[in-house]
């Protein structure tokens, strides 16, 4: 069964699958969708990550903790987790959203991750939901340092590779679509130690490169 595969990827087995099904349902696909779950999951995620950072960095000030949390809970990071779980294969979208490639859109992917966090909370309680967030984020949290939250993904990737005496990444524009005022850039990022080619998407070349670098970092720092 498809949902069995997804639950293995998530590392959590639902007692009530209805919660998971609702978390996977976008508002374009019906009335019983994941919007309310996303609202709740956002709060649980912020608390879980805030708690982990508070305990991990006893000397960090409020500003540093806030910046690190913002880095970890932002849309791009959640979308990377969603792709790792392959959520695009399991989400239920309306016909229009499906046709426009909604299953690839970062906002939809990130909302789905937050909805799943809420679904776990409803299924098993707060302690389990927090533990699950910590499990998903354990490698990202291990790499996090107070000053790093202010650095962009390209800088962090460069420093990660330099610190291990590895060659720097190469970026290349794959294509540019749209009119001058509304363009979408696709950029590849390659590093020597990984065979995989990472594709970043953004409204500018810089944003696309940052997106690709973020994906590489996630690959390097998650199991």
Swiss-Prot record:
Its cofactor is Mg(2+). It comes from the Bacteria. The keyword Signal does not apply. Disulfide bonds: none annotated. It catalyses: Endonucleolytic cleavage to 5'-phosphomonoester. Transmembrane segments: none annotated. Residues 3-125 form the RNase III domain. One of its GO terms (cellular component) is cytoplasm. Residues 152-222 form the DRBM domain. It is found in: Cytoplasm. Homodimer. Belongs to the ribonuclease III family. Digests double-stranded RNA. Involved in the processing of primary rRNA transcript to yield the immediate precursors to the large and small rRNAs (23S and 16S). Processes some mRNAs, and tRNAs when they are encoded in the rRNA operon. Processes pre-crRNA and tracrRNA of type II CRISPR loci if present in the organism. This is Ribonuclease 3.
């Amino acid at each position: 069964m498809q949902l069995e595969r997804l639950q293995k990827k998530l590392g959590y087995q639902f007692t009530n699958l209805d919660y998971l099904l609702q978390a996977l349902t976008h508002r374009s696909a019906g009335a019983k969708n994941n919007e309310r779950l996303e609202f709740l999951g956002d709060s649980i995620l912020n608390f879980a990550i805030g708690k982990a950072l508070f305990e991990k960095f006893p000397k960090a000030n409020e500003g540093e903790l806030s910046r690190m949390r913002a880095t970890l809970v932002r849309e791009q990071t959640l979308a990377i987790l969603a792709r790792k779980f392959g959520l695009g294969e399991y989400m239920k979208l309306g016909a229009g959203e499906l046709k426009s490639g909604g299953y690839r859109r970062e906002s939809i992917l990130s909302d789905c991750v937050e909805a799943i966090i809420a679904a776990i909370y409803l299924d098993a309680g707060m302690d389990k939901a927090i533990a699950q967030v910590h499990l998903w984020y354990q490698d990202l949290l291990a790499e996090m340092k107070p000053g790093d939250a202010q650095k962009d993904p390209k800088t962090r990737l460069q420093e990660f590779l330099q610190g291990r005496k590895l060659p720097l990444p190469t970026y290349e524009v794959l294509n540019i679509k749209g009119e001058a005022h509304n363009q979408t850039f696709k950029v590849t990022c390659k590093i020597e130690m990984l065979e995989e080619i990472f594709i970043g998407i953004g409204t500018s070349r810089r944003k696309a490169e940052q997106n690709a670098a973020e994906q590489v970092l996630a690959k390097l720092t998650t199991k």
